[in-house]
Each structure stands twice: as structure tokens, then as C-alpha cells.
Amino acid sequence: MISKIQNFKYLKGGLNKHWPIKKDISYDFQCDVMQKIGYTINDLNDVLENIDKTSRKDVVYIVMLASWIQEAVKSLFECYPEEICKNFVYADEDLLNKGRKYLEAIRSFICAHPLKASRHTAYGFDGTEICVDIRFETKMLLVFGIDKHRYIDFEGIHNGKNDKSDFYLYCYSKESKKKLEFANYIGCSYSDIYKVADLYINKVICFDNYLKKLKRKEFIKQNEQIR
């Protein structure tokens, strides 16, 4: 079962501080970014109510919502100068980086470049694969042997079938003389996509806690001593 993405009820007020924000960025813009993240969290959690009845368009929708969170969190951190962020450490940064690469690969192959995704070789998308369709498990799909199945997760692409896969990318190799000669299925899991989004939200919550503990006078004094 996929857990709902944590929301902003866990924020402690650090992101409400005006003084840490870059001088050339308004606090209103930061609030707009936070609002975008909040609405997207709600949208992703709403989809969970019928996650077992999703369609092809729902797959695209979920991938794009997670990508919106990724982009919005990036924009949020860009609201703060380097001297504010340099001492912030996110414990799950390594896992988040793996999740980011995974999400970018999924988004590229499904939404952005289904005919020529070539920048995600660790996930099998090296420019030789074409994404023909998004499919769900059926009796017809099970007819294909294990050699026709692969799956992807945070660690990359793997041979074989993963029972945790929720949907499949139906694709074939452009290197084949006969277009369907090298047809295969790549399994993907909703839980991995939701995990990426949740890691980003958790980073925001941790950053909020970091900002709450940050005192303006102490920060200015420390930076003056460094200079």
C-alpha cells in the first residue's frame, strides 16, 4: 500500500521568515511556490484513492505531478542565497538524487521524448528504445516470456519481471530490422514515483526546521567573522 505524501502541517514556521530570502526575490513569490507544492501534494494524494483503477492518462498525470513537485522544490531553494543554504544537510540527499534521476528518466520516456529518450542510459533509455504505449497487466501481457520483461527502480534497469510493477512501458528497439522483433515491456511502480515526491517534501520540511533555528543576529555575526 502506498502511503500518502506528508503535507505541510509539519512545518514549524521557518519558511515564514522573510530575512533569509534573496533580496531580489519577493516573499510573495516564495509563497506562490509553496502554494504550488501544497496543491500538487493534494492532487497526488487524491489520485491514491483510486490508484487501483488508473488509466494511461493517470500514469502521465502522476508522473507530471511528481515532476511539478521536483521543479517547485528546486525553485524554492533558489529563493535563498548560498550562505543561507550551505550549512543545511538533508540526511536522505543521496537517496533523493537517485530518485531524481529515476523520475527524470520516467518523465523523458513517457512524456517528453518517447521516440528518442537518450540521456538516461542507467535506466535503459539510451536512444535505441521507442515507447509505443503504456499498458497494464493482462492475460495477453503474461503470454510474453520473462525474456521480454524488464523493470526499473531507483537503482536502474533490471532484467526479468517485478511483481510490484503497476504499469508497463511497451517499447521496441530502433536497432531491430523488424520493428516488433525486439519488443519488450518495462515495469514501473507507482510507489517509486510517490517515494520521489515524498523525499522532496521531506527535504522542504527539514529545511523549514533548519530555518526556524537560524537566528538573524547570529547568522550576520558569523558571516562577518568569516569575511
Residue ranges and their predicted role:
Residues 19-83:
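Short, contiguous, well-structured surface segments enriched in hydrophobic/aromatic residues
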Residues 1-39, 88-227:
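Acidic, Ser/Thr/Gly/Pro-rich intrinsically disordered interaction regions
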